[in-house]
Design a protein with these regions (language model features):
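Conserved acidic carboxylate
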Residues: 9
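Charged docking surfaces used in two-component/phosphorelay signaling
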Residues: 16-24
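Short hydrophobic/Thr-rich beta-strand motif most characteristic of the beta2 strand and flanking loop
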Residues: 26-33, 41-42
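Conserved Asp/Asn-Gly motif in the active-site loop of CheY-like receiver
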Residues: 32-36, 109
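The feature encodes the CheY-like receiver
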Residues: 57, 75, 87, 105-106
Length: 121
């Protein structure tokens, strides 16, 4: 059985880039375009890992992470924040919201896969 990854990203081009990076890895990829869709997808699909953009419509990625981590049935799902905000303190903000890890953009396919495999191996 393949491992499920939920990609939460509002920009179609960025979702496509991640899909392309993960093509051929054997992971089953699903997507959500905003915070509300992400919460519904997590509850229904129970992915093994979430790649979460920080900036999302309806609810930012950090609020989504907080809500997931507040749910005892979901809190064990690793969340990796993927953000273009490589500012000082952004990683601290991501971790404070409940994200298990952080990948600043731009990142290489190798970097992203290494982070994913760290949690799914």
């Amino acid at each position: 059985m393949s491992k499920r990854i939920l990609v939460v990203e509002d920009q179609p081009d960025n979702r496509q880039i991640i899909r392309d990076m993960l093509a051929g890895t054997g992971y089953e990829i699903s997507e959500a375009e905003d915070g509300e869709q992400a919460l519904v997808a997590v509850a229904k699909q129970r992915p093994q890992l979430i790649l979460m953009s920080a900036q999302l419509p309806t609810m930012d990625g950090y609020e989504v992470a907080r809500q997931i981590k507040a749910d005892p049935a979901l809190r064990s799902i690793p969340i990796i924040a993927v953000t273009s905000h490589a500012l000082n303190g952004e990683e601290k903000t991501a971790r404070a919201a409940g994200c298990d890890d952080y990948v600043p953009e731009p990142y290489s396919p190798r970097q992203l896969l290494a982070k994913i495999r760290q949690y799914l191996s």
